[in-house]
């Protein structure tokens, strides 16, 4: 393998620069926790830490549509760095949206404020699958450029790449947008299981390719978000979802970076989500971490899981609930502190800053 080659055979960031990133971040508390190694303190980061809770985010995003902002490397880098500067979190997460790879391959979609992703022409027939072409690095040059900027700025702080999981992307594509009950999604899954299997398999290939671009540009870990999969029963997850999610994790396995799997309302699915191949399983606030560890089984670190709404309570109450999370995590093989879902837009950013400091202080070894 030449200096510029990657496991996928694509020409990308030089191996020397990637080696420098890996060396700088290797002993970070976040990556050590992902590997279930001893840590100087429990690492902390937050889903949606870069976003509307920060006044500096609102300022730089003013007048710029969400999808447009995801394709502006300097803006992406600035937004990604903002919570690292403000909160002193232990990891940055790349600022983007889960539908970016779909937009990049030509799917006609938009993110409508107050609604979410809206698909102009939903995917509902076998003929529609032809619109889901391969994703290449050339489709997302802004990702490679932004991550190059970020790794230069972040130094020893790891950058997490991310993507939407096949089920959640499929739900958006089939429904045409967000859905409370996922009627059309489930109708395809149950009524035409082969079409469904082909759809999520195709999305697994696209998602895997998107994560590879991020890793090859310098991401030190990746997280697969399955926002809607909590709508499924375990048997349906095993049959109709797990193979596609596993395909994504298998695609990035050769890179050796930690792989995180997170879904909302997935307490009954935690063991299956671990089976899909993640090194770290994210847990929402509904299941205590010690019980989550029992469900997931050995050999996995856990991430979570403070209820985001707790941050609206007075500081003593936040600290009490935080101690409950830390106590439940006391016997885990590896623990990354996070919220059980994303940061809410109207959350006081100072509460997040205090939370990071409190977790670091309480868990200092």
Curated annotation (Swiss-Prot):
Regarding protein family, the annotation reads: Belongs to the uroporphyrinogen decarboxylase family.
Keywords for the protein's UniProt record, in alphabetical order: Cytoplasm, Decarboxylase, Lyase, Porphyrin biosynthesis
Q: What is the lineage of its organism?
A: Bacteria, Bacillati, Actinomycetota, Actinomycetes, Kitasatosporales
Q: What segment(s) does the record annotate as region Disordered? A: 1-20
Q: In which pathway does it act?
A: Porphyrin-containing compound metabolism; protoporphyrin-IX biosynthesis; coproporphyrinogen-III from 5-aminolevulinate: step 4/4
Q: Where is this site: Transition state stabilizer?
A: 97
Report the subcellular localization. Cytoplasm
Major enzyme class: lyase
Q: Could you tell me one molecular function GO term of this UniProt entry?
A: uroporphyrinogen decarboxylase activity
What is the name of the protein in this document?
A: Uroporphyrinogen decarboxylase
Domain of life of the native organism? Bacteria
Q: Which reaction does it catalyse?
A: uroporphyrinogen III + 4 H(+) = coproporphyrinogen III + 4 CO2
One example of a Gene Ontology biological process annotation: protoporphyrinogen IX biosynthetic process
Q: HAMAP family under this entry?
A: URO_D
Is this entry keyworded Flavoprotein? no
Task: Spell out the Polar residues composition-biased ranges.
Answer: 1-17
């Amino acid at each position: 393998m030449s200096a510029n080659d990657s496991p996928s055979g694509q020409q990308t960031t030089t191996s020397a620069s990637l080696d420098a990133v890996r060396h700088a971040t290797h002993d970070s508390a976040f990556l050590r926790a992902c590997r279930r190694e001893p840590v100087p303190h429990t690492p902390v980061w937050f889903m949606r830490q870069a976003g509307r809770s920060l006044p500096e985010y609102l300022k730089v995003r003013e007048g710029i549509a969400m999808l447009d902002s995801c394709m502006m490397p300097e803006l992406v880098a600035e937004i990604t760095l903002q919570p690292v500067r403000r909160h002193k979190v232990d990891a940055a997460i790349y600022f983007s949206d889960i539908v970016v790879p779909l937009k990049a391959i030509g799917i006609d979609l938009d993110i409508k404020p107050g609604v979410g992703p809206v698909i102009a022409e939903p995917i509902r027939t076998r003929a529609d699958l032809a619109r889901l072409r391969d994703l290449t690095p050339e489709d997302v040059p802004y990702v490679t450029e932004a991550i190059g900027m970020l790794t230069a700025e972040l130094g020893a702080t790891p950058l997490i790449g991310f993507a939407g999981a096949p089920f959640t992307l499929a739900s958006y594509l089939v429904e045409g947008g967000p859905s409370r009950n996922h009627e059309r999604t489930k109708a395809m899954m149950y009524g035409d299981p082969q079409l469904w299997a082909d759809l999520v398999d195709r999305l697994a290939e696209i998602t895997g390719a998107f994560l590879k671009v991020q890793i090859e540009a310098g991401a030190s870990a990746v997280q697969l978000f399955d926002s809607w999969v909590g709508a499924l029963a375990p048997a349906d997850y095993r049959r109709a979802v797990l193979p596609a999610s596993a395909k994504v994790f298998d695609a990035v396995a050769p890179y050796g970076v930690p792989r995180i799997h997170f879904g909302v309302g997935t307490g009954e699915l935690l063991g299956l989500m671990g089976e899909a191949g993640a090194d770290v399983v994210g847990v929402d606030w509904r299941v205590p971490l010690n019980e989550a560890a029992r469900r997931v089984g050995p050999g996995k670190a856990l991430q979570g899981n403070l209820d985001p709404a707790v941050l609206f309570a007075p500081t003593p109450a936040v600290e009490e609930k935080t101690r409950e999370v830390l106590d439940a995590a006391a016997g885990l093989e590896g623990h990354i502190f996070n919220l059980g879902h994303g940061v809410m837009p109207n959350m006081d950013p100072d509460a997040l800053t205090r939370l990071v400091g409190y977790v670091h202080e309480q868990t200092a070894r």
